[in-house]
Amino acid sequence: MGISRDSIHKRRATGGKQKQWRKKRKYEMGRQPANTKLSSNKTVRRIRVRGGNVKWRALRLDTGNYSWGSEATTRKTRVLDVVYNASNNELVRTKTLVKSAIVQVDAAPFKQWYLSHYGVELGRKKKSASSTKKDGEEGEEAAVAAPEEVKKSNHLLRKIASRQEGRSLDSHIEDQFASGRLLACISSRPGQCGRADGYILEGKELEFYMKKIQKKKGKGAA
């Protein structure tokens, strides 16, 4: 039978059935949704569409390019989990990647960039007095084993110092770096272009989705 986007198979406004007066047409054809799943076994299909054009139907993905707007940088990173979808909870349960889905991405590539750009290591946990003593003993052993740090040139040090002047970081994002997972939104259409690209959530948008996710967790616990 196939999925048809015509109106010939629909009833009339009065409720009566219409007689099929012509065969189906190729241009009225519909295709089933991609329902791109989160999986390390990347699978993307090439689909020939009207006009001889091509669509890329992603069936399984686990990586994408995510931009950090306030820092004007983009990094390829792993998608770890789907945590929220405004339209459908079923898509969260089945870990389906669609446009505007809220996902958790790996923070490591951004952490690495931040260290090289600002000379600041993000996500380091604050140590208590008891743990510092233990770390002191372990640190001595590690210092012997660890390779020497690459010496930075004076020019690079000046450049990092000038960047430090205008540096500011949202406290919510800093907390996320400590956990190693950043909340992001998918802005591409995986079922159409075969990619799950997006942007890191910040500011008011981040606060909004954090509240939504927290509310959902509260309902689940009840």
Curated annotation (Swiss-Prot):
Keywords: Ribonucleoprotein, Ribosomal protein
PROSITE patterns registered for this protein in UniProt: RIBOSOMAL_S8E
GO CC annotations, alphabetized: chloroplast; cytosolic ribosome; cytosolic small ribosomal subunit; nucleolus; plant-type cell wall; plasmodesma
InterPro entries the UniProt entry points to: Ribosomal_eS8, Ribosomal_eS8_CS, Ribosomal_protein_eS8_euk, Ribosomal_Se8/biogenesis_NSA2
Biased composition (Basic residues): 8-26
Pfam families: Ribosomal_S8e (PF01201)
One Gene Ontology biological process: translation
Gene3D superfamilies assigned to the protein according to its UniProt record, in alphabetical order: 3.10.290.70, Ribosomal protein S8e, subdomain
Source organism, top-level taxon: Eukaryota
Chain spans, region Disordered: 1-37, 125-147
Gene Ontology molecular function: mRNA binding; structural constituent of ribosome
UniProt KW Ribosomal protein keyword: yes
Stored NCBIfam families: eS8
Family: Belongs to the eukaryotic ribosomal protein eS8 family.
Name of the protein described by the UniProt record: Small ribosomal subunit protein eS8z
